[in-house]
């Protein structure tokens, strides 16, 4: 028996490369094919799918195409398939897969997991003291004023392990955590106990790294010029050992890059504190060791784990107010005055500002002085209005703006609707539930197996606390100006209505400078539009990294955010474009051109 389990990922989001599953299965040896399809935004998308196309849906339909391509090969090679593509309807997906298997003549055992759906139990749970307090707004769900349309508990990996223990070849999951599709198979392979927290933490870190697919193999990488090719970027494989240490790699002959840098970037993606919470374990990101172990091979070891928290996270989506966004291009001189006149005309035509519950105005100054092309003379005026009265928005709202086409400022040209179209938006409501109310249900043939979370079992509480690390200050003599991103990498993303921006250095000296330079106050100076938000800073000296957690920057989450970049994917590159002063020695050490 092999002393490792090789878990390949074939998807980082709903819409990822369709051929990735087949390429992962046929490209080399793996033991498990996994995929993550469920971003917070995806649950809202699946709800809309179910509402508009039928209650029999609510799952990730493209996964069925992948199963059709790889089911026979996986059965022949004894490759297990574990995916959260079941979304809001894991039973429906499992039934659809069984039909495909029958058509193909493939004899694979399909299990599905449910029990995560709380929509019908919200009132009962509230009567038992579960307030479903928003972890961002700190107000209970009953005060939201919105109707709940989805509510799903984030499960861990133990039900997956149970299904595999009982012989399942394909395990269809609902809203499990992103890393659960790795934790479950690893726990199955090595027969881990519930309190093997260090090993579980290692698998959690491995799952976090590979859950976004090609992103840890050079995708969206700050130092993209290091990546040999972006053609056919490979998808990641985690080679996990019994102690939870692992190596990240990809199939040979694929594009992309697996390096300490690409893995560090992914480790910093969509996190908050160094304590990474999961229903099965808390992984301490400040304890891990990362090292290059060969071409396209990065080894991670030393991860410490603690007992899981006493609560499970719940992803709730509610029906919010109606929103509509329009964007108009203003051109040439006197942009701010033109914007003022245009907005005054819009609201006069609509009957006044006061009729709307909220108004968000963004003037995006992409125009250049003395432009050399027509497009360089444009600035974008972006307007989003919110109302609980749908009659004030939609076609009427757009018509009233269109009427200004020949009767307003010179050089305006409409981009029309961009994003919100006047319909009700789905508002993301992250909450917690006491784990005593949680049980995971495994369906395998005629059998129904209840799996209790670790929190409901009798285990001693264990908590790891890392010793503080003292960072030496770098002596500063001669300084030079340079773009922040010439020296430092970033990776940013969304966490509900919040965003994170991880920053890392590539040498000890560069980290020493970064550690003392990039305070929260300094970040707000560099990014003035972030000044109004509460920001927390966390240190990860083992990765030469800092992480900034920015509260409320995305409003009520990606599905209703007013920002152009609703998921904060570009925030890090915005920071990297800023000009700063640094010690000249750092520029020389890294051989960077100013």
PLM regions: where:
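N-terminal amphipathic/basic leader segments beginning at the initiator methionine
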Residues: 1-23
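Gly-rich Lys/Arg/Thr-decorated short loops/hinges at beta-loop-alpha junctions or inter-strand turns
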Residues: 2-4, 40-56, 75, 117-146
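Conserved phosphate/anionic-ligand binding catalytic regions in large, soluble enzymes, centered on
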Residues: 84-89, 168-185, 490-507
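Catalytic or ion-translocation cores adjacent to nucleophile or general acid/base/metal-coordination motifs
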Residues: 102-118, 183-224, 228, 516, ...
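A conserved active-site cap/scaffold subdomain adjacent to cofactor or substrate pockets
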Residues: 200-302, 323
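Short, Gly/Pro- and small/polar-rich lid/capping loops
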Residues: 270-298, 458-488
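C-terminal non-catalytic interaction/assembly regions of soluble proteins
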Residues: 302-482, 495, 504-511, 516, ...
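Helix-rich interaction surfaces within compact, conserved domain-sized segments
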Residues: 533-594
